[in-house]
Amino acid sequence: MNFMLTLLTNTLLALLLVTIAFWLPQTNVYSEKSSPYECGFDPMGSARLPFSMKFFLVAITFLLFDLEIALLLPLPWASQANNLEVMLTTALLLISLLAISLAYEWSQKGLEWTE
């Protein structure tokens, strides 16, 4: 019962804060406030640098693979548990997921830097 009350309270509080942030208007928005500031001088170049979407996709792919590998790190300590078959099955599933997702990324040309 305490868990459900805590979960309900946290959910309602989060929804309330998101609603307040969404509905409150942003005040005092004018061009001077939203323009880039470069030590009191006019900017020498564009403040908005172009962003490579390919770099973003490779970075997200790296983070996902890094997270999956981090899931494998505690497995040597899990090998000391009573149920070794569950640990080996979990390791096999994680490694299979890594291999399948790597093959998919490779087939979709998601790992190639040039277009």
From Swiss-Prot:
GO terms for molecular function: NADH dehydrogenase (ubiquinone) activity. Its EC number is 7.1.1.2. GO terms for biological process: mitochondrial electron transport, NADH to ubiquinone. It is an enzyme of class 7 (translocase). Keywords: Electron transport, Membrane, Mitochondrion, Mitochondrion inner membrane, NAD, Respiratory chain, Translocase, Transmembrane, Transmembrane helix, Transport, Ubiquinone. One of its GO terms (cellular component) is NADH dehydrogenase complex. The chain crosses the membrane at residues 3-23, 55-75, 84-104. It is a multi-pass membrane protein. The keyword Mitochondrion applies. Its main location: mitochondrion. It catalyses: a ubiquinone + NADH + 5 H(+)(in) = a ubiquinol + NAD(+) + 4 H(+)(out). It is found in: Mitochondrion inner membrane. Core subunit of respiratory chain NADH dehydrogenase (Complex I) which is composed of 45 different subunits. Interacts with TMEM186. Interacts with TMEM242. Belongs to the complex I subunit 3 family. Core subunit of the mitochondrial membrane respiratory chain NADH dehydrogenase (Complex I) which catalyzes electron transfer from NADH through the respiratory chain, using ubiquinone as an electron acceptor. Essential for the catalytic activity of complex I. This is NADH-ubiquinone oxidoreductase chain 3. It comes from Rhinolophus pumilus. The gene is MT-ND3.
